[in-house]
Amino acid sequence: CSGCDRKAQVNAEPESSEKIEYAVTETEEVFTETKKLVIEDLDDAYEALLDSCSKEFIGDYRIDESFLNWVYANYGKEAVLNIAQESQEDQNVNVWYEETGNSIHVLWLLYCQDTGMNEEDLQQVYWKTCSSEDEIVLDFTGDINFAEGWGTTEHMDGQPNGINDCFSKDLLQEMNHADIMMINNEFTYSTRGEPLAGKDYTFRADPKRVALLETFGTDIVSLANNHVYDYGEAALIDTIDTLEEAGIPYVGAGKDLKDAMRPVYFVANGKKIAIVSATQIERSLNYTKEATETTPGVLKTLNPDKFLKVIEEARDNSDYVIAFVHWGTEGNNYFGSDQVALAKQFVEAGVDVIIGGHTHCLQGMEYMDGVPIIYSLGNFWFSASTLDTGLSQVIIRDDGTIDFRFLPCIQKNYKTSLVTDERSEEHTSE
C-alpha cells in the first residue's frame, strides 16, 4: 500500500458533508494564536497529521504520507479523520489504539511488515495471542535451577513424572495460562568450561534440559544473574545458543554489549510491551563478567548508566516497560537503600513495573510514583528448604491500566505449590 496514490483514494470516496473541527496552535516569538480549522476530507486530515509530525514525532515515529495511506487502506477514512482530530487537539497518541485496536507502536510494526521497510524495527519482537481480548497477563518467577548434581535436579530425575512432580498441578496450570511467562534462568546450559576458581557455588545444566522450560510455558528468560557465567565465556555462549535453538528469547546478557543491552518486545492485544533486565550483582566481586563491545557477559547496573539507556530506548519504542533486576543481599528479607535508589532512577527513566530477584528469599513490595515494585521473588525452585515464594503477576487492562498481584507459593521438599487455604493451614501448623 506504500505506493498507493492518495489522491486516487480520496477521489474514490463519496462526497462527505461532515465537518470536523480541530485546533492548531501557532507560536511566533511572544504570542500564541489558536485557530479553528475544518477537516472536510482526507486531504485535510493528512495535512493536519503531517503538519503535526513536522513539529513533533507521534509516538516517536516520523509519520509520513506512505504510513497514512497504509492506515487509510487498513482502517478506513473515519479512523484517519478521528485520529487527525484528536492528535491536533492534544497530541493524544492513545487515539491510534482507540480507532484501530493497535497502538502507534504496533501500527508501525504492522506497517513495516506489510511494506518491508525498516526491517530492523522488527528485530526482537514476538507476537502473542492472548486468552482474553480484555487483558494481557504476565507471570514472573524467581530463581530456577536445572544444574547437574544439584538437589532439585537429582530429585526431579528420580520422580515418575519428572518435573511435573516438582510443581503442583494448579501452579503449572497458572504458569501455562499466562499470556507471557518469564523466569530467572539462574545457571548455564553447557557441557564446556570449568567452574570459576574460588566461587563457592557454580551451576551448569546439560543443554538438553532447556526442554524443561516448556513445562512452564516459558516465553522469555533473564540471564542477568551471578550464575550464568559460572563456567566461563564458552559456557555463556553455549547458553545463548541453546536458548536461541529452543526459540526462547533472553534478556540481560549477550555475546557482546549490544546483545546484552537489547530489549525484548512482545506484541499482544494491540499493545507493545518491552522487557529489559540487568544485574547489580556482584557488587564487590567480579566472577560474572560484564559484556563489552567485543566480549560476552551480562549487563550490569551497579552503575546504572547503561541500563538507564536501555530503559529509555524501550520507553521510546513501546507502550509498557517491565524491568527484571537481579539485586539485593542474599538471605536478607528487607530491601536495601541501594535497591531503592536504583528503583528511583529506573522509575524516572520510564519503567512501568520492576520485578526483582537474587536474595533467595522474598523481599517487600511497594509503589513508587505509581510504579509497582517487588524487590525480590526469592527462590522459586532452587533448594530443598521450606521457603515462601510466589509468582508476580502483571495484568495490563484494555483501558491501559496495570494491575499488580502476588500469588503466594510454598517451596517444600523440592516441590513448589500454589498456596491454597488448605496448604496455607498445613504450612502454618508446621
Task: Please tell me what each predicted stretch does.
Residues 127-429:
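Acidic, metal/ion-coordinating pockets
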Residues 2-3:
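C-terminal motif of bacterial Sec signal peptides marking the signal peptidase cleavage site
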Residues 110-129:
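Short, low-complexity, Pro/Ser/Thr/Gly-rich segments in the mature regions of secreted, periplasmic
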Residues 45-115:
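Active-site-proximal alpha-helical
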Residues 26-28, 33-35, 101, 116, ...:
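N-terminal compositionally biased, intrinsically disordered segments and leader/signal-like regions
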Residues 6-42, 124-137, 153-166:
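N-terminal, intrinsically disordered, polar/charged segments of Gram-positive cell-envelope systems
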